[in-house]
């Protein structure tokens, strides 16, 4: 019995955030155009603490170098293994669903069941 209690109390190592999964699944969401909203990169490439690399004019995707810089920035707004404590997921989530009260870019997801929110949560939880 004591062994089970020990395991439950032992600190868990957070999952490692995977760059390739980020580039394949997360970064495209930052470039996605949503009805009634600007793409994340439009606002987050200037004037915010969450600063993404500007997308070069005429480009639809980032170079690997720019993606790595974005990955390093995004990691600052994520608590690996804890999507419910990660600002990347909470800022654009509706307040009624547990998101922050305000996000200047609007609320992109009404619930945690939104496929985009789930994609981000899966990545934060160590998914590939």
List the predicted regions and their residue ranges:
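Sec-dependent signal peptide recognition
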Residues: 1-7
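Aromatic- and Gly/Pro-enriched helix-to-coil junctions and flexible linker segments
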Residues: 9-128
């Amino acid at each position: 019995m004591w062994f089970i209690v020990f395991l439950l109390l032992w600190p868990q190592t957070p999952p490692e955030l995977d760059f390739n999964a980020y580039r394949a699944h997360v970064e495209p969401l930052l470039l996605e155009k949503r009805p009634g909203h600007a793409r994340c990169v439009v606002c987050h490439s200037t004037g915010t603490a969450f600063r993404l690399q500007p997308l070069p004019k005429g480009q639809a995707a980032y170079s690997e170098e720019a993606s790595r810089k974005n990955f390093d920035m995004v990691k600052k707004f994520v608590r690996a293994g804890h999507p419910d404590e990660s600002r990347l997921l909470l800022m654009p989530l509706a307040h009624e669903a547990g998101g922050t009260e305000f996000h200047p870019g609007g609320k992109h997801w009404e619930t945690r069941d939104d496929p985009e929110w789930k994609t981000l949560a899966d990545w934060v939880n160590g998914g590939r």
